[in-house]
From Swiss-Prot:
Gene3D superfamilies: 1.10.287.70, Cytochrome c oxidase, subunit III, four-helix bundle. It comes from the Eukaryota. It is found in: Mitochondrion inner membrane. It catalyses: 4 Fe(II)-[cytochrome c] + O2 + 8 H(+)(in) = 4 Fe(III)-[cytochrome c] + 2 H2O + 4 H(+)(out). This is Cytochrome c oxidase subunit 3. Component of the cytochrome c oxidase, the last enzyme in the mitochondrial electron transport chain which drives oxidative phosphorylation. The respiratory chain contains 3 multisubunit complexes succinate dehydrogenase (complex II, CII), ubiquinol-cytochrome c oxidoreductase (cytochrome b-c1 complex, complex III, CIII) and cytochrome c oxidase (complex IV, CIV), that cooperate to transfer electrons derived from NADH and succinate to molecular oxygen, creating an electrochemical gradient over the inner membrane that drives transmembrane transport and the ATP synthase. Its EC number is 7.1.1.9. GO terms for molecular function: cytochrome-c oxidase activity. The chain crosses the membrane at residues 53-73, 77-97, 122-142, 169-191, 217-237, 269-289, 298-318. InterPro entries: Cyt_c/ubiquinol_Oxase_su3 (IPR024791), Cyt_c_oxase_su3_dom (IPR033945), Cyt_c_oxidase-like_su3 (IPR000298), Cyt_c_oxidase_su3-like_sf (IPR035973), Cyt_c_oxidase_su3_a-hlx (IPR013833). Belongs to the cytochrome c oxidase subunit 3 family.
Length: 329
């Protein structure tokens, strides 16, 4: 089987050994198979952002979306079309912007170790901001459930709400997400195997010697495929649960907090699944290596964050917030 080794030249010229050209690759068996010409090779290790039109265009798209949404809420003409156009422009800007980031990392060698440290800090701060986002919804739920008002009948769950059984679909979704966390960790463990270093620095052109790399990529891709499948399965079951539920988002504070919190988490699951799908295709195209795969690592961090949030959500809203009687329905 013939492999695509185009990315190897960039990885070892710009990433390995502090990402400066200190490694002579001319005698490596895969060097002469590279077909991509790398014009950009930075000689420093810092994150110098190049000129890009996407921040400006993304801001315009966000303005169109929010302005159109406000117009639609006030029944102004063409408000829905403006918000829809802004939404699709946001998706387009996300695609082209992240496409350029992938090019800078994989093909231009701009994501040095120093740059990756900054990116890691950025992802950590982003996840912390997401934690605060979910914290506000959990605060609303516990504010209403710990001291239910007279309007709710002074009980929780409120009178007239037929809550869901936590031991049915919610428990199944919990097991699905926990299993997906296991499979994505398995995939991450395989790609971080440092025994690949012997393969990369060998001059052998023997197909049997190349087999371990192919095997590791197959195992890594298979584990990642399982994770994506489990994420899609979780989304399907969550949608089925919404379809079968007897209460709606407008059924008081219970319905609003339930659907807002679980729906927000479901949106994050969809985003995380798309993130992992992109990583899956990048993995197949050999964009990742044992010491240079931060894009995949960021997706794994995000997926584990989604797992942890669901555990808190399952224990608080589904189990504790539904009352003891819900276990026997």
């Amino acid at each position: 089987m013939k492999l695509n080794y185009d990315f190897f030249l960039n990885k070892f010229n710009n990433v390995y050994n502090n990402d400066i050209r200190l490694v002579d690759l001319s005698n490596k068996w895969w060097y002469h198979n590279c077909r991509v010409h790398f014009a950009g090779n930075q000689k420093h290790s810092f994150h110098i952002v190049t000129r890009s039109p996407w921040p400006l265009y993304s801001s315009i798209a966000a303005l169109m979306f929010t302005f159109g949404l406000v117009m639609h809420m006030h029944n102004y003409f063409y408000g829905n079309l403006l918000s829809l156009a802004g939404f699709f422009l946001i998706l387009l800007m996300m695609f082209v912007w992240w496409r350029d980031v992938i090019r800078e990392s994989t093909f231009s060698g701009y994501h040095t170790k120093k740059v990756q440290q900054g990116l890691r800090l950025g992802v950590i701060l982003f996840i912390i901001s997401e934690v605060m986002f979910f914290f506000s919804f959990f605060w609303a739920f516990f504010h209403a459930s710990l001291s239910p008002s007279v309007v709710l009948g002074s009980v929780w769950p409120p009178l007239g709400i037929n809550v869901l059984n936590p031991l049915k679909i919610p428990l199944l979704n919990t097991l699905i997400l926990l299993l997906s966390g296991l499979t994505v960790t398995w995939s991450h463990h395989v790609i971080r195997d440092k025994s690949w270093q012997k393969f990369f620095f060998s001059n052998s052109n023997n197909e049997e010697f190349k087999a371990p790399l192919l095997d590791n990529y197959v195992i890594c891709a298979f584990a990642l495929f399982l994770t994506v499948f489990l994420g899609l399965e979780f989304t399907v079951w969550q949608g089925y649960e919404y379809y079968k539920a007897s209460f709606y988002i407008y059924d008081g504070v219970y319905g609003s907090t339930f659907y807002m919190t679980t729906g927000l988490h479901g949106l994050h699951v969809i985003i995380g699944t798309l993130f992992l799908i992109v990583c899956f295709f990048r993995l197949i195209d050999l964009h990742f290596i044992y010491n240079h795969h931060f894009g995949y690592e960021a997706a794994i961090w995000y997926w584990h964050f989604v797992d942890v949030v669901w555990i808190f959500l399952f224990l608080s809203i589904y189990c504790w917030g539904s009352g003891v009687d819900s276990f026997f329905k």
